[in-house]
């Protein structure tokens, strides 16, 4: 079975690197984007199995990224997990309208995020 490809979108290079290392150690193939425009371009190019998306990005809002991706037939079924420092309660309406699948507030618990990734991908939790 091929590795699941996960697009990590965050303007913080340290977060991208850390998540990439952790996900790669669990058998996932991480790909990266640091802003809204590259997120859409990378998604088109890489066709990831899942997207981890920050909301506060250069060159556009994370919700606009979700809306653009969900509007593309080739990408509309890709699960999107938002990982942001924003307050999820304050973001609730926009989050629901965007079509994103889950919301984690930074700092997040990596094991909980991993469980959400596995559920979204329909894979068994790694031992």
Identify the residue ranges that each predicted region occupies.
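The feature encodes the CheY-like receiver
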Residues: 16, 58, 76, 88
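Charged docking surfaces used in two-component/phosphorelay signaling
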Residues: 17-25
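Short hydrophobic/Thr-rich beta-strand motif most characteristic of the beta2 strand and flanking loop
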Residues: 27-34, 42
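Residue-level signal for the "D+5" position in two-component response regulator receiver
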Residues: 32, 57-60
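Acidic catalytic/metal-coordinating carboxylates
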Residues: 35-38, 61-67
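Active-site beta3 strand of CheY-like receiver
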Residues: 46-52, 57
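Alpha4 helix (beta4-alpha4-beta5 surface) of REC/receiver domains from two-component response regulators
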Residues: 64, 87-104, 111, 115
């Amino acid at each position: 079975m091929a590795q699941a490809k996960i697009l990590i979108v965050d303007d913080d290079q340290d977060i991208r690197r850390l998540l990439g290392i952790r996900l790669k150690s669990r058998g996932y193939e991480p790909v990266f984007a640091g802003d809204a425009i590259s997120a859409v371009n990378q998604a088109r190019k890489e066709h990831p199995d899942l997207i981890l998306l920050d909301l506060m990005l250069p060159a556009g809002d994370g919700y606009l990224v979700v809306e653009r991706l969900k509007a593309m037939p080739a990408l509309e079924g890709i699960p999107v997990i938002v990982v942001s420092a924003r307050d999820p309660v304050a973001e609730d309406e926009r989050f629901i309208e965007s079509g994103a699948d889950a919301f984690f507030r930074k700092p997040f618990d990596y094991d909980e995020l991993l469980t959400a990734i596995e559920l979204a991908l329909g894979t068994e939790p790694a031992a």
